[in-house]
Design a protein with these regions (language model features):
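A conserved helix-loop-beta module that forms one wall/lid of the active-site cleft
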Residues: 4-97, 102-127
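S-adenosyl-L-methionine
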Residues: 1
Length: 173
């Protein structure tokens, strides 16, 4: 089935208006992946399946302790994402490799630490004109094997392009 982009944008605008009634800046709220996941899970529990986020948040203040204390408790495969921005996804397979930015690295705690500290080095999404900074966090979620992927490219909360990729062939449109 085809996705009606105009209808999708209407739904997003409608949800932003609903959120504004109790949250001052809906655009910011919907810009955070983890908060968006909780919102979708709460409002569309039977319509949309999402990867389950683990209750682990990583930032540059706790990256070492998380790796030392939590890594052994995680399943063999899991995903790490930035809570904001796109394109920062790490797929960890503790039996084999770490995939990050289309590169494969041998799995080791040291390699994972290097990747995470690189991601967190640029952990502030800020306007240089403003004093406030918005700290960037990483979150962990379950690994869900998929054969195809949809990416919604948005500018100012509006979908401008939908990218569809077949992961087993590398084809996209």
């Amino acid at each position: 089935s085809r996705i009606n982009v105009e209808k999708f944008n209407e739904m997003i605008e409608y949800e932003k208006k609903k959120i504004k009634s109790y949250k001052e800046d809906a655009a910011i709220y919907l810009g955070y992946k983890l908060q968006s996941k909780y919102y979708i899970k709460k409002n569309y529990p039977n319509d949309i399946h999402l990867a389950v986020p683990y209750n682990i948040i990583i930032n540059k203040d706790n990256v070492t302790s998380v790796l030392l204390e939590k890594l052994d408790m995680l399943p063999d495969k899991f995903v790490i994402k930035k809570n904001k921005l796109s394109g920062y996804t790490v797929i960890v397979d503790k039996n084999e490799k770490i995939s990050y930015q289309e590169q494969k690295y041998k799995y080791s705690t040291g390699n994972l630490y290097e990747i995470l500290t690189t991601m967190l080095r640029y952990d502030y999404d800020k306007n240089p004109e403003e004093q406030e900074t918005d700290k960037m966090d990483l979150f962990l979620e379950e690994y869900v094997p998929v054969k195809e992927e949809f990416k919604f490219h948005c500018i100012h909360g509006r979908v401008i392009m939908i990218e569809h990729s077949l992961l087993n062939t590398g084809l996209s449109n």
